Amino acid sequence: MNYKERRQLIYELIQTNKIETQEQLLLLLQAHGANATQATISRDIRALHISKVPDDDGRSYYVKAPSAAVNRERQLKDAIRERVATVTAVQFTVVIQTSMKLTYAPILAGLIDDIDNDDVVGTIAGTDTLLVILKDAEAAASFADWAQAIVKERKIY
């Protein structure tokens, strides 16, 4: 079994079993015909971005880390919730005004550029204003509605 097959098997095993230790993982791999050392398993775990998370009983199990795409979308939502003052759709664009006069619009533009959204054509950022260019007016309205809903989630103390 080559390393790609072994790593695929590791993913399958952690999704179907509650594995607490590398030793347990090694035994399961061996039961499935994969011969590896503990050092190899440790490298595979790092390479696959597998981490341990506690369950309700306080025991920790290996799990597949959230994908980068999920993390980027969460970062974008957090940024919109915390830093955006207004969102306005104008034809096939969305104008976003940040709530801080600090150069936050370029950061927000980078987050938008990084998400996997086929409707977003590109972004242009100034200091506190961001222009999101979308493929059409319908996509712009949808994006604006999505962003406005996130802004409304902001808690005011």
UniProtKB/Swiss-Prot annotation:
Pathway: Amino-acid biosynthesis; L-arginine biosynthesis [regulation]. The keyword DNA-binding applies. It comes from the Bacteria. Its main location: cytoplasm. It is found in: Cytoplasm. The keyword Amino-acid biosynthesis applies. It holds the Pfam family Arg_repressor_C. Signal peptide: none annotated. Disulfide bonds: none annotated. GO terms for cellular component: cytoplasm. One of its GO terms (molecular function) is arginine binding. One of its GO terms (biological process) is protein complex oligomerization. Keywords: Amino-acid biosynthesis, Arginine biosynthesis, Cytoplasm, DNA-binding, Repressor, Transcription, Transcription regulation. Regulates arginine biosynthesis genes. Belongs to the ArgR family. PANTHER family: ARGININE REPRESSOR. This is Arginine repressor. It comes from Lactobacillus delbrueckii subsp. bulgaricus (strain ATCC 11842 / DSM 20081 / BCRC 10696 / JCM 1002 / NBRC 13953 / NCIMB 11778 / NCTC 12712 / WDCM 00102 / Lb 14).
